[in-house]
Protein backbone atom coordinates (compact mmCIF):
# COMPACT_ATOMS: atom_id res chain seq x y z
CA UNK A 1 0.00 0.00 0.00
CA UNK A 2 1.08 3.57 -0.68
CA UNK A 3 0.90 6.32 1.93
CA UNK A 4 1.68 10.01 1.55
CA UNK A 5 4.67 11.36 3.48
CA UNK A 6 4.52 14.78 5.11
CA UNK A 7 6.98 17.02 6.91
CA UNK A 8 6.61 18.29 10.47
CA UNK A 9 5.31 21.54 8.97
CA UNK A 10 2.51 19.64 7.21
CA UNK A 11 3.94 19.91 3.69
CA UNK A 12 3.94 17.05 1.18
CA UNK A 13 7.18 15.07 0.96
CA UNK A 14 6.40 12.31 -1.52
CA UNK A 15 5.05 8.86 -0.69
CA UNK A 16 6.23 5.59 0.80
CA UNK A 17 5.36 1.97 0.06
CA UNK A 18 4.17 0.02 3.10
CA UNK A 19 4.26 -3.77 3.18
CA UNK A 20 0.84 -5.44 3.23
CA UNK A 21 2.31 -8.11 5.51
CA UNK A 22 2.82 -5.45 8.20
CA UNK A 23 0.27 -2.71 7.57
CA UNK A 24 -2.32 -4.46 5.40
CA UNK A 25 -3.55 -7.34 7.57
CA UNK A 26 -7.15 -7.75 8.66
CA UNK A 27 -6.86 -6.87 12.38
CA UNK A 28 -7.50 -9.68 14.86
CA UNK A 29 -8.81 -8.30 18.13
CA UNK A 30 -8.09 -11.53 20.00
CA UNK A 31 -4.35 -11.33 19.32
CA UNK A 32 -4.22 -7.64 20.20
CA UNK A 33 -6.12 -8.27 23.43
CA UNK A 34 -3.78 -11.10 24.44
CA UNK A 35 -0.75 -8.88 23.94
CA UNK A 36 -2.25 -5.93 25.84
CA UNK A 37 -3.20 -8.20 28.75
CA UNK A 38 0.34 -9.61 28.75
CA UNK A 39 1.87 -6.12 28.82
CA UNK A 40 -0.38 -4.85 31.61
CA UNK A 41 0.06 -8.00 33.71
CA UNK A 42 3.84 -7.76 33.33
CA UNK A 43 3.88 -4.13 34.46
CA UNK A 44 1.56 -4.68 37.45
CA UNK A 45 3.45 -4.15 40.70
CA UNK A 46 1.83 -6.97 42.68
CA UNK A 47 2.73 -5.36 46.02
CA UNK A 48 -0.68 -6.05 47.60
CA UNK A 49 -0.35 -7.72 51.00
CA UNK A 50 -2.39 -8.44 54.13
CA UNK A 51 -1.27 -10.21 57.28
CA UNK A 52 -2.30 -13.78 57.92
CA UNK A 53 -2.93 -15.25 61.37
CA UNK A 54 0.73 -16.30 61.65
CA UNK A 55 1.88 -12.68 61.18
CA UNK A 56 -0.46 -10.96 63.65
CA UNK A 57 1.10 -9.77 66.92
CA UNK A 58 -1.33 -11.07 69.49
CA UNK A 59 -1.24 -13.61 72.29
CA UNK A 60 -1.60 -17.22 71.31
CA UNK A 61 -3.13 -18.22 74.61
CA UNK A 62 -6.44 -20.07 74.48
CA UNK A 63 -9.24 -17.56 75.10
CA UNK A 64 -11.13 -19.66 77.61
CA UNK A 65 -11.40 -23.28 78.61
CA UNK A 66 -12.69 -25.80 76.11
CA UNK A 67 -15.78 -26.94 77.96
CA UNK A 68 -18.30 -25.59 80.39
CA UNK A 69 -18.68 -21.96 79.32
CA UNK A 70 -21.42 -22.43 76.72
CA UNK A 71 -19.38 -20.52 74.15
CA UNK A 72 -18.01 -21.81 70.85
CA UNK A 73 -14.67 -23.63 70.98
CA UNK A 74 -11.99 -21.00 70.26
CA UNK A 75 -8.26 -21.48 70.46
CA UNK A 76 -6.53 -18.27 69.36
CA UNK A 77 -7.42 -14.59 69.17
CA UNK A 78 -5.41 -14.40 65.92
CA UNK A 79 -8.11 -16.33 64.05
CA UNK A 80 -9.79 -14.54 61.11
CA UNK A 81 -13.25 -14.39 62.71
CA UNK A 82 -12.04 -12.02 65.44
CA UNK A 83 -11.59 -8.29 65.08
CA UNK A 84 -7.88 -7.64 64.63
CA UNK A 85 -7.26 -11.23 63.61
CA UNK A 86 -5.34 -12.36 60.54
CA UNK A 87 -6.90 -12.32 57.09
CA UNK A 88 -7.86 -15.72 55.68
CA UNK A 89 -6.50 -16.30 52.16
CA UNK A 90 -5.54 -12.63 51.78
CA UNK A 91 -3.47 -11.20 48.91
CA UNK A 92 0.29 -11.77 48.99
CA UNK A 93 3.15 -10.11 47.14
CA UNK A 94 3.50 -11.86 43.79
CA UNK A 95 4.20 -11.34 40.12
CA UNK A 96 1.18 -11.18 37.81
CA UNK A 97 3.31 -11.80 34.71
CA UNK A 98 2.51 -14.69 32.41
CA UNK A 99 4.16 -16.02 29.29
CA UNK A 100 3.24 -15.08 25.73
CA UNK A 101 5.18 -16.60 22.82
CA UNK A 102 7.43 -14.23 20.86
CA UNK A 103 5.71 -15.13 17.61
CA UNK A 104 2.33 -14.16 19.05
CA UNK A 105 3.76 -10.85 20.27
CA UNK A 106 5.26 -10.11 16.87
CA UNK A 107 2.01 -10.99 15.11
CA UNK A 108 0.00 -8.84 17.52
CA UNK A 109 2.27 -5.87 16.76
CA UNK A 110 1.68 -6.28 13.03
CA UNK A 111 -2.07 -6.47 13.61
CA UNK A 112 -1.97 -3.32 15.77
CA UNK A 113 -0.09 -1.48 13.01
CA UNK A 114 -2.62 -2.74 10.46
CA UNK A 115 -5.50 -1.59 12.67
CA UNK A 116 -4.08 1.95 12.79
CA UNK A 117 -3.56 1.98 9.03
CA UNK A 118 -7.09 0.70 8.42
CA UNK A 119 -8.66 3.33 10.70
CA UNK A 120 -6.72 6.18 9.10
CA UNK A 121 -4.70 6.78 12.25
CA UNK A 122 -1.29 6.20 10.63
CA UNK A 123 0.88 9.15 9.58
CA UNK A 124 4.35 8.95 8.03
CA UNK A 125 6.69 11.93 8.25
CA UNK A 126 10.10 12.27 6.67
CA UNK A 127 12.01 13.31 9.80
CA UNK A 128 11.59 14.76 13.30
CA UNK A 129 14.68 16.96 13.21
CA UNK A 130 14.06 20.45 14.56
CA UNK A 131 16.00 23.63 13.92
CA UNK A 132 15.50 24.61 17.55
CA UNK A 133 14.22 22.53 20.45
CA UNK A 134 11.26 24.71 21.41
CA UNK A 135 8.06 23.19 22.79
CA UNK A 136 5.91 26.09 21.56
CA UNK A 137 7.18 25.70 17.99
CA UNK A 138 6.66 21.93 18.09
CA UNK A 139 3.09 22.37 19.34
CA UNK A 140 2.46 24.54 16.30
CA UNK A 141 3.73 21.75 14.04
CA UNK A 142 1.49 19.24 15.80
CA UNK A 143 -1.47 21.57 15.39
CA UNK A 144 -0.86 21.77 11.63
CA UNK A 145 -0.78 17.96 11.50
CA UNK A 146 -3.89 17.65 13.67
CA UNK A 147 -2.09 15.76 16.44
CA UNK A 148 -3.68 15.99 19.88
CA UNK A 149 -3.04 12.39 20.99
CA UNK A 150 -0.20 10.58 19.25
CA UNK A 151 2.59 8.05 19.59
CA UNK A 152 5.63 9.13 17.59
CA UNK A 153 8.18 6.48 16.63
CA UNK A 154 11.62 7.47 15.33
CA UNK A 155 14.58 5.35 14.27
CA UNK A 156 17.11 3.68 16.55
CA UNK A 157 17.98 7.06 18.08
CA UNK A 158 15.33 9.71 18.74
CA UNK A 159 16.46 13.18 17.71
CA UNK A 160 17.54 14.79 21.01
CA UNK A 161 16.05 18.21 20.30
CA UNK A 162 12.71 16.72 19.30
CA UNK A 163 12.54 14.52 22.41
CA UNK A 164 13.33 17.52 24.62
CA UNK A 165 10.70 19.72 22.99
CA UNK A 166 8.00 17.02 23.08
CA UNK A 167 8.43 15.68 26.60
CA UNK A 168 6.14 18.27 28.25
CA UNK A 169 3.33 18.06 25.70
CA UNK A 170 0.37 16.10 27.12
CA UNK A 171 -0.88 13.00 25.29
CA UNK A 172 2.24 12.88 23.09
CA UNK A 173 4.61 9.92 23.50
CA UNK A 174 7.97 9.63 21.75
CA UNK A 175 9.81 6.30 21.47
CA UNK A 176 12.68 4.83 19.47
CA UNK A 177 11.81 1.94 17.17
CA UNK A 178 13.03 -0.57 19.78
CA UNK A 179 10.28 0.62 22.15
CA UNK A 180 7.31 0.21 19.82
CA UNK A 181 4.59 -1.85 21.48
CA UNK A 182 0.93 -2.75 21.07
CA UNK A 183 -0.40 -1.02 24.20
CA UNK A 184 1.14 2.38 23.44
CA UNK A 185 -0.08 2.18 19.83
CA UNK A 186 -3.66 1.62 20.97
CA UNK A 187 -3.77 4.18 23.78
CA UNK A 188 -3.14 7.11 21.41
CA UNK A 189 -5.39 8.22 18.54
CA UNK A 190 -2.61 8.63 15.98
CA UNK A 191 0.54 6.65 15.22
CA UNK A 192 3.29 8.75 13.63
CA UNK A 193 6.21 6.92 12.03
CA UNK A 194 9.31 8.47 10.56
CA UNK A 195 10.72 7.03 7.36
CA UNK A 196 13.56 5.59 9.45
CA UNK A 197 10.99 3.80 11.63
CA UNK A 198 9.20 2.40 8.57
CA UNK A 199 12.50 1.09 7.19
CA UNK A 200 13.32 -0.51 10.55
CA UNK A 201 9.92 -2.22 10.72
CA UNK A 202 10.26 -3.50 7.16
CA UNK A 203 13.70 -4.92 8.02
CA UNK A 204 12.42 -6.46 11.25
CA UNK A 205 9.49 -8.32 9.70
CA UNK A 206 10.87 -9.16 6.27
UniProtKB/Swiss-Prot annotation:
Signal as UniProt keyword: no
GO cellular component labels: ribonucleoprotein complex; ribosome
GO molecular function, one term: rRNA binding
Family of this protein: Belongs to the universal ribosomal protein uL4 family.
UniProt xrefs under PANTHER family: 50S RIBOSOMAL PROTEIN L4 (PTHR10746), LARGE RIBOSOMAL SUBUNIT PROTEIN UL4M (PTHR10746:SF6)
Oligomeric form and interacting partners: Part of the 50S ribosomal subunit.
Protein name: Large ribosomal subunit protein uL4
Species assigned in the record: Nitrobacter winogradskyi (strain ATCC 25391 / DSM 10237 / CIP 104748 / NCIMB 11846 / Nb-255)
Gene: rplD
Amino acid sequence: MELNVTTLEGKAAGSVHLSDGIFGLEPRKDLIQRCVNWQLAKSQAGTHKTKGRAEIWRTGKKLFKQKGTGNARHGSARAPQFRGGGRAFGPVVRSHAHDLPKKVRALALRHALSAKAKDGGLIVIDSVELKEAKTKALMGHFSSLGLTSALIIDGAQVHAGFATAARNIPNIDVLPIQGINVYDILRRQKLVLTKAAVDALEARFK
